[in-house]
UniProtKB/Swiss-Prot annotation:
This is Putative protein YbfL. Signal peptide: none annotated. Pfam families: DDE_Tnp_1, DDE_Tnp_1_assoc. GO terms for biological process: DNA transposition. InterPro entries: ISAs1_transpos, Transposase_11, Transposase_11-like, YbfD_N. NCBIfam families: transpos_ISAs1 (NF033564). It comes from Escherichia coli (strain K12). It comes from the Bacteria. PANTHER family: H REPEAT-ASSOCIATED PREDICTED TRANSPOSASE, PROTEIN YBFL-RELATED. Belongs to the transposase 11 family. GO terms for molecular function: DNA binding; transposase activity.
Length: 378
């Protein structure tokens, strides 16, 4: 995870300001912003305050001859950066410094930045789709859409930027689309898609193929696991089968389709022993040659994007409460949060959660320096 390479990529982002008016370099402003967000900054004022407090420290890493820009300058400059160029730099950085093996599951999922809407300019909240390496807990790419419904068109754009050869790509039911399946196959990856009512004929075929009797006593490859936590007990049954002859026509519609998969969960509250457990059935299709156990692992890994990314963004970084919305700033700040999460996740020396790492970085320059050194910047 080389931060030095990130700064090399960032240095090619065009600065559209008039050169003779530039007092603070774009690369320095971005460096300041990234360091500040690593240390818990949530606003432009926080970034300015961090810079004023750590100016001597920052001078070791960048050009701050003219001191720290005021928060209005930081906001104006960052909000004018091209999101496309920024995302290109981010993805190229991750491609340079992060290698993932063929067993990785890449979870693609979207998240709405709730307070990024701007009533005065009649702009709705933006929706950011992230590609998350579940093996390494790292964001490897992101793209913005204006609405969740636009995920269908945005996911192929995100895939265009990624190297997915040999990887399994997982999405929720929104991403279960024939065009997306074909694209993943063309790029050398495999898909594992959740199936719901948006694919009516496919969903009905699952219901007919896997009646309740089959779920209670599966004839196909199956794998069960149980878990107790928070006063609840959950038993999960996973079933995988080849596409049967009577459903072979689906293999012509869905490029590379090999497996039909079912996940059944029985959830009960331990204190309420007499209560019937709640049963949930979920259907999936996959082009990967999965066993029931590998299927169980893959769908469990998919939820890492919620637990290890979206939860951190909301609860630790307060993303949903962030009202930064000027120009392209909401989208850019989202990407900078992803950079901060990746860098802090890469730190294996201080074994603590993200919140403690951010606080320690804010209070301890030596720790912040070690985090940066661990990311190739010293």
């Amino acid at each position: 995870m080389e931060l030095k390479k990130l700064m090399e990529h960032i240095s090619i982002i065009p600065d559209y300001r008039q050169a003779w008016k530039v007092e603070h370099k774009l690369s320095g402003i971005l460096l300041l912003t990234i360091f500040a967000v690593i240390s818990g900054a949530e606003s432009w004022e926080d970034i300015e305050d961090f810079g004023e407090t750590h100016l001597d420290f920052l001078k070791q890493y960048g050009d701050f001859e003219n001191g720290i820009p005021v928060h209005d300058t930081i906001a104006r400059v960052v909000s004018c950066i091209s999101p496309a160029k920024f995302h290109e730099c981010f993805i190229n950085w991750m491609r340079d410094c992060h290698s993932s093996n063929d067993k990785d599951v890449i979870a693609i999922d979207g998240k709405t930045l709730r307070h990024s809407y701007d009533k005065s300019r009649r702009r709705g909240a933006i929706h950011v789709i992230s590609a998350f390496s579940t093996m390494h807990s790292l964001v490897i790419g992101q793209i913005k859409t204006d609405k969740k419904s636009n995920e269908i068109t945005a996911i192929p754009e995100l895939l265009n930027m990624l190297d997915i050869k040999g990887k399994i790509i997982t999405t929720d039911a929104m991403g279960c689309q024939k065009d997306i399946a074909e694209k993943i196959q063309k790029q050398g990856g495999d898909y594992l898609f959740a199936v719901k009512g948006n694919q009516g004929r496919l969903n009905k075929a699952f219901e007919e193929k896997f009646p309740l009797k089959e779920l209670n006593n599966p004839e196909h490859d199956s794998y069960a696991m149980s878990e107790k936590s928070h006063g609840r007990e959950e038993i999960r049954l996973h079933i995988v089968c080849d596409v049967p002859d009577e459903l072979i026509d689906f293999t012509f519609e869905w490029k590379g389709l090999k497996k039909l998969c079912v996940a059944v969960s029985f959830r009960s509250i331990i204190a309420e022993q007499k209560k019937e457990p709640e049963m949930t059935v979920r259907y999936y299709i996959s082009s990967a040659d999965l066993t029931a156990e590998k299927f169980a692992t893959a769908i469990r890994n998919h939820w890492h994007v919620e637990n290890k990314l979206h939860w951190r963004l909301d609860v630790v970084m307060n993303e949903d409460d962030c009202k930064i919305r000027r120009g392209n700033a909401a989208e850019l700040f989202s990407g900078i949060r992803h950079i901060a999460i990746n860098i802090l996740t890469n730190d294996k020396v201080f074994k603590a959660g993200l919140r403690r790492k951010m606080r320690k970085a804010a209070m301890d320059r030596n720790y912040l320096a070690s985090v940066l050194a661990g990311s190739g910047l010293s």
